[in-house]
């Protein structure tokens, strides 16, 4: 797989590192990792840099992951870029809401590198 740039949006710096490690363990060749601590920071990052994959938490201060997703989709900041939501939210309504907002994948915390691989790799192949 070719090198990719990933934007990881989560209000926990520890979780951002865990997600990065899981992506690497899943076999992704990450050339660059852009980190954002809120949806607002993620939105700003995409105004200046292009990502090949976006991984975002849902529950964050300032701008949650769903609003972040809606805004990047409506502004055309991530056309054709797969977005995967990683969150502790377990209800099916959260999955439906994320998919309706424009996410292509949804992973519940806690997760394994295998779960990340199984949900992310097909999205990158089809992107």
Predicted regions and their residues:
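C-terminal output helix
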Residues: 111-120
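Active-site beta3 strand of CheY-like receiver
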Residues: 49-55
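Helix N-cap/capping motif at the beta->alpha junctions
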Residues: 35-44, 65
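Short amphipathic alpha-helix used as the core "switch/output" element in two-component signaling
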Residues: 44, 66-79
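Two-component/phosphorelay signaling modules centered on CheY-like receiver
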Residues: 13-34, 123
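Receiver (REC) domain active-site loop signature in two-component systems and cognate sites
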Residues: 60
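Active-site residues of response regulator receiver
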Residues: 57, 87
């Amino acid at each position: 797989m070719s090198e990719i740039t990933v934007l990881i949006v989560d209000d926990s710096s520890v979780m951002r590192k865990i997600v990065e490690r899981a992506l690497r363990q899943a076999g992704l060749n990450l050339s660059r990792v852009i980190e954002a601590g809120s949806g607002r920071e993620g939105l700003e990052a995409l105004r200046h840099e292009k990502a090949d994959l976006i991984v975002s938490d849902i529950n964050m201060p300032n701008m949650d992951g769903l609003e972040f997703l809606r805004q990047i989709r409506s502004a055309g900041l991530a056309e054709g870029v797969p977005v995967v939501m990683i969150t502790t939210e377990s209800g099916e309504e959260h999955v439906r809401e994320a998919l309706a907002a424009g996410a292509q994948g949804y992973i519940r915390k806690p997760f394994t590198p295998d779960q990340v691989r199984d949900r992310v790799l097909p999205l990158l192949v089809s992107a």
